[in-house]
């Protein structure tokens, strides 16, 4: 088994959801996480705040990301899977996919 990173991305201007729709979306996320935990493949994950800072060469710090970008990283999971195809199959259940979100699946290198 190997560890894989799921990076959840979405439009900086997502469709506005009503409070009732947000509750349904959050329940889908919680159900997905619980399913991954029951299968013993969920290792970690958290949503990310919409803004942050970037450290560059010579210790220059810039604000960002900005809404001009195509997509914002909204969160991450670390999961355990036998290979990237199995990890992709897990990612297909992401509740944001039907709303236009994306999931980038990356193999985490062992060091």
Predicted regions and their residues:
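Conserved, structured core segments of small domains
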Residues: 1-111
């Amino acid at each position: 088994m190997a560890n894989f990173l799921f990076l959840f991305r979405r439009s900086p201007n997502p469709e506005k959801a009503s409070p009732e729709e947000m509750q349904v979306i959050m329940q889908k996320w919680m159900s997905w996480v619980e399913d991954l935990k029951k299968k013993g493949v969920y290792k970690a994950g958290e949503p990310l705040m919409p803004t942050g800072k970037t450290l560059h060469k010579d210790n220059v710090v810039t604000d960002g990301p900005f809404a001009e970008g195509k997509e914002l990283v909204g969160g991450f999971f670390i999961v355990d899977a036998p290979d990237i195809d199995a990890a992709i199959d897990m990612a297909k259940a992401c509740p944001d996919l039907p709303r236009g979100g994306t999931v980038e699946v990356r193999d985490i290198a062992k060091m």
